[in-house]
Amino acid sequence: MNIDVANLLTGNYILLLFVVLALGLCLGKLRLGSIQLGNSIGVLVVSLLLGQQHFSMNTDALNLGFMLFIFCVGVEAGPNFFSIFFRDGKNYLMLALVMVASALCIALGLGKLFRWDIGLTAGMLAGSMTSTPVLVGAGDTLRQTMADNPQLGQLQDHLSLGYALTYLVGLVSLIFGARYLPKLQHQDLPTSAQQIARERGLDNDTQRKVFLPVIRAYRVGPELVAWADGKNLRELGIYSQTGCYIERIRRNGILATPDGDAVLQVGDEIALVGYPDAHARLDPSFRNGKEVFDRDLLDMRIVTEEIVVKNSNAVSKRLSQVKLTDHGCFLNRVIRSQIEMPIDDNIVLNKGDVLQVSGDARRVKSVADRIGFISIHSQVTDLLAFCAFFIIGLMIGLITFQFTGFSFGIGNAAGLLFAGIMLGFLRANHPTFGYIPQGALNMVKEFGLMVFMAGVGLSAGAGMRHGLGEVGGQMLIAGLIVSLVPVVICFLFGAFVLRMNRALLFGAIMGARTCAPAMDIINDASRSNIPALGYAGTYAIANVLLTLAGTLIIIVWPGVVG
């Protein structure tokens, strides 16, 4: 039996799509030295090669892919988006604005200098910034503003071509910039990170291990009573001295949960809860008492829950003010915008931050009720809210502004982005509304992006060889400039205008570029995870600004809007 693969793929768009995705994802796992190609560039390269062989795909799939992707970007940004505008995130907002605005202006200037059309220029901006949101915003605005223009198809092909030619240039140059730029400035990055760690009481260890608290019980002996010196538990401050707290006391056969006024007596049996290393460091006064193995005394349900910060008594408060340990709970992680933050007593909590907390189930529930809510342990997505806000985003995208002489519409990209932000924001405030498991959100976002990249590559592949010969050299030069010059401008602005700590500044710069591989290099250079504070500060707003930059570059290009 003979199978004509070419005819099979040509006649079956779904099969073609998944063949492109499978081959592209395999290619994306390859590494060039320490740099992994990544799924996006893998799918794009495969689709470009097949596009050269005149394979094509239904554009509806491409449109659906970009819509799903940009909507999910908004949902992820929503919980922390508005706090950036209203509080101490102004520096991060300004850095993200400087990064995006400078890249946009430089791209426009180079496009005019090399006499490119808007497709090549916008594609070059998206690739140099390694930003799919720019590509999505530009592509959608092109379709909205030039629907009746016979050049639309060519401009869309050029958009894909510009992105494909400059993506690797942007990624590699930024990684090298992240490696060497910190060495060119006079402040040592590890020293800057240690300075922040000292000032804020951060854990500067990038390999911090997280253990579940354990329970051990002891019979109180004379040494421990002498050590307590008649003070009650509140006055002793057991946790601050030992890292453990007394959860239960058995006295004269009666088991009770002690309050702060309790005073230890010889013969008491106490249940201590703490991390293993805290138990190991206990004062000999505790260990000199005989360890007790009592089922009732040790029968506690230690749980670990993710608590979403929501309530006013925690939002805009420092972590130290929440006083988790006073409520018998242990903090394992602080997560913001899916980025793990250093444990910092002075970090200001934002609405939507996630605190991973361990402790007795009752105590954890009490803390969750006080500061927010426990994240839902469910794999069920609120599809009704997802679909409703998706429809709202499409409706917003239909809005058109009419001015004398020209008009322009908001477009699907901006509309869906805004609707996604609102869904994410509402989800952070209402625990039972709009729940989307993070795994499901990641899957939809990644799948939408891959479908979009496959469609982009297949449509642009036919003209790639001709375009590469005409503008290939210019694209490489322009890609380097747009990738690196805004980074330098952002560094100068942050260092000498905002006077930011260098570790935070370089983290914020990588967040403004939304580049996780470069962020890893900055963490290694600082021998700390302190830069994650800066990365989280700019990442969410940068994704939104980059999408708007893709829209704006089309609108301001002469002759497009009219």
UniProtKB/Swiss-Prot annotation:
PROSITE patterns: RCK_C. The keyword Signal does not apply. Keywords: Cell membrane, Membrane, Repeat, Transmembrane, Transmembrane helix, Transport. Its main location: membrane. The keyword Iron-sulfur does not apply. The chain crosses the membrane at residues 8-28, 32-52, 66-86, 94-114, 118-138, 158-178, 383-403, 406-426, 443-463, 477-497, 541-561. Signal peptide: none annotated. Residues 202-288, 290-373 form the RCK C-terminal domain. It is a multi-pass membrane protein. It is found in: Cell membrane. InterPro entries: AAE_transporter, RCK_C, RCK_C_sf, Transp_YbjL_put, YidE_YbjL. Belongs to the AAE transporter (TC 2.A.81) family. YbjL subfamily. This is Putative transport protein NT01EI_2530. It comes from Edwardsiella ictaluri (strain 93-146). The lineage of its organism: Bacteria, Pseudomonadati, Pseudomonadota, Gammaproteobacteria, Enterobacterales.
